[in-house]
Amino acid sequence: MATIGIFFGSDTGQTRKVAKLIHQKLDGIADAPLDVRRATREQFLSYPVLLLGTPTLGDGELPGVEAGSQYDSWQEFTNTLSEADLTGKTVALFGLGDQLNYSKNFVSAMRILYDLVIARGACVVGNWPREGYKFSFSAALLENNEFVGLPLDQENQYDLTEERIDSWLEKLKPAVL
């Protein structure tokens, strides 16, 4: 088992594709990505380093049945983590959103995961600058005007995804390897 676990929730399959790309770029130092609807709490807690990916649905929600998803996803999985101790774990987040059509909640679901893992004692790494995006609001922005993780827009900036992932992974290396 590798020391890095990649977990994702998805609605349309785009987050799964990005998780697979990240796994490929990590070239053997991470286990294959796990969809949270098939993952167990024990699998999640077994990794010292977690890369967590989510799309943002509706009004800034995590994917899940309550948000209109067809399947269970992050909404349901986070319930299994309500008492989890993530102290000593390093977490990095990536989120998918559409900054033009959902400008008022661009990648806001990343903030829900961020708040959850911080409250459980994890150390979050991999903040990303706001520059290069055009949106009106994102709950995923911190006070320093950086995102809590890597925002990706597969609808409007898909041509920047691979370059952004490469830069983000380089930034993460000192903290996760």
Swiss-Prot record:
Residues 4-173 form the Flavodoxin-like domain. Pfam families: Flavodoxin_1. Keywords: Electron transport, Flavoprotein, FMN, Nitrogen fixation, Plasmid, Transport. One of its GO terms (biological process) is nitrogen fixation. One of its GO terms (molecular function) is electron transfer activity. Coiled coil: none annotated. Its cofactor is FMN. PROSITE patterns: FLAVODOXIN (PS00201), FLAVODOXIN_LIKE (PS50902). PANTHER family: FLAVODOXIN 1, FLAVODOXIN 2. Belongs to the flavodoxin family. Low-potential electron donor to a number of redox enzymes. NifF is the electron donor to nitrogenase. This is Flavodoxin.
